[in-house]
Amino acid sequence: APSYVLNQLILKGMHRTYDELVSEYDFKDYAFSKLRERYKAWTGNSMEEKLFDSFDMRDEHGKLTNAGALLADDSPIRHSRLFCTRWNGLDKSGGMVDALDSAEFSGSLIILLNEGVSFVKRNMKTRWKKTADSRVEMPDYCERSVFEALVNALIHRDYLILGSEVHIDIYDDRLTIYSPGGMADGTRIQERDLSSISSTRRNPVLADIFGRLGYMERQGSGFKKITETYRAAHNYRDELEPKFYSDASSFQVTLYNLNYGTAA
């Protein structure tokens, strides 16, 4: 079995999760300006030092937990990165040479989230439709769905799988968000009823922090929200329903371009 599978079993046996384990990194060596900024914007309060303890981001000796390390501005966890590519066409056959846009991001999960959403926004178009008294905005992708899918990828990915990172791949007709690690409970998402998925959390500390920052709801899964947002789009058709796929070591969300193949 791959080493990450053995590590998963060890953690399971200890009733511990990756994000709560203490790292070798000292809290005092890292800045958390993005986290502080977001906390202030969301709650209206400055982030007090003691919150780093109650958020389980550091231990009593001043060492960061893995969750803390993942949220440091300059995160020392090197495989926490985001690769974004806008491919030319419907697949990757043209290769990177032909890619229309590409970027790689590292740092705090908050940076990855913001940069990922910005990358998608700059690579999509918005159409307008005139109605009797106003005009309707029709973007290629529902920004809320992109946001939810990326939060999901960053928070629920398996950080024990090294040499793999989160990818956003944009094609002419769709975009995919890929993350290492299948469903935390070992099931296959494509065989499940999305409306009844209980949130088994691979990284409960990260999920809790993102909940406190207003990035995700404490209860329930983002899958339903991704699909509902799509269905509510002005230019939605049934064949454009978002697709979810997982296997033992990966998870992928496909969001379809709502304007692809339709007359302008």
Provide a role label for each language-model segment.
Residues T65, D172, S246-S250:
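Short Gly/Ser/Thr- and Asp/Glu-enriched loop/turn motifs at secondary-structure junctions
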Residues D26-K28, R78-L82, L90, T187-I189, ...:
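Flexible, glycine-/charge-rich segments associated with ATP-binding catalytic modules
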Residues D73, P180, Y256-L258:
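Solvent-exposed residues in well-ordered beta-strands and their adjoining turns
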Residues D172-G181, D185-G186, Q252:
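Short, highly conserved beta-strand within the GHKL-type HATPase_c fold
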Residues A1-S164, I170, G186-R188, R192, ...:
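Active-site helix-to-loop segments that bind/position phosphate- or nucleotide-bearing substrates
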